[in-house]
């Protein structure tokens, strides 16, 4: 039934709507003075039965209710990245998400479950080993430079010459490290 103004005061059942989404939030009785309309954010049209996981949303233009999926407050996971997505709006879930959370690092979605992505883990470990190797090479070069200066100027002490040889040997051994075997690397000991 559509609301019609009246010359008489009356009390009618109304269905309250949440401003912004027009979703049903409850019902109650409203006193309607003569020659006035319904209170803001309400209708006198009863909502349909609302199944779990849905809300009733009122379309003011059509004067009708629609059932809309409601996953707000829940977390889903992007199947491409594994990133958590918090659902904060009404409507169906975004495409390419799952309710299942990835267990740990280096997981990929196989269409039905998260599985270990050994290739991604291997590449990560290789990049990590390359970064470690580069950092250690920089440390070695920083130690070698002043010692080499002293040797070139023929003012190096016996201890400096010994340290220079140790650091150069370390740098050569470090340079031979094969980072493609990332998890099995035995790093040379610092001098």
Swiss-Prot record:
Q: Which domain of life is it from?
A: Bacteria
Fetch the InterPro entries from UniProt. Answer: Phage_T4_Gp38_tail_assem, TFA_Chaperone
Similarity comment: family membership: Belongs to the tfa family.
Q: What is this protein called?
A: Prophage tail fiber assembly protein homolog TfaQ
Organism source for this protein? Escherichia coli (strain K12)
The organism's taxonomy opens as:
Bacteria, Pseudomonadati, Pseudomonadota, Gammaproteobacteria, Enterobacterales
């Amino acid at each position: 039934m559509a609301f019609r103004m009246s010359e008489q005061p009356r009390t009618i059942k109304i269905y309250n709507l949440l401003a912004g989404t027009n979703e049903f939030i409850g019902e109650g009785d409203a006193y309607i003075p003569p020659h006035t309309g319904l209170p803001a954010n309400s209708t006198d049209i009863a909502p349909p039965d609302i199944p779990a996981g849905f809300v009733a949303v009122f379309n003011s233009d059509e004067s009708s209710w629609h059932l809309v999926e409601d996953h707000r407050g829940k977390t889903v996971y992007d199947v491409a990245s594994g990133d958590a997505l918090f659902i904060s709006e009404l409507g169906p879930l975004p495409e390419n998400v799952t309710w299942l959370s990835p267990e740990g690092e280096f997981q990929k979605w196989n269409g039905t479950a998260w599985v270990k992505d050994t290739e991604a883990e291997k590449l990560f470990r290789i990049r990590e080993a390359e970064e470690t190797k580069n950092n250690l090479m920089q440390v070695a070069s920083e130690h070698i430079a002043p010692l080499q200066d002293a040797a070139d100027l023929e003012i190096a002490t016996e201890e400096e010459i010994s340290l220079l040889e140790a650091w150069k040997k370390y740098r050569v051994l470090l340079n031979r490290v094969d980072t493609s075997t990332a998890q099995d690397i035995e790093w040379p000991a610092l001098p």
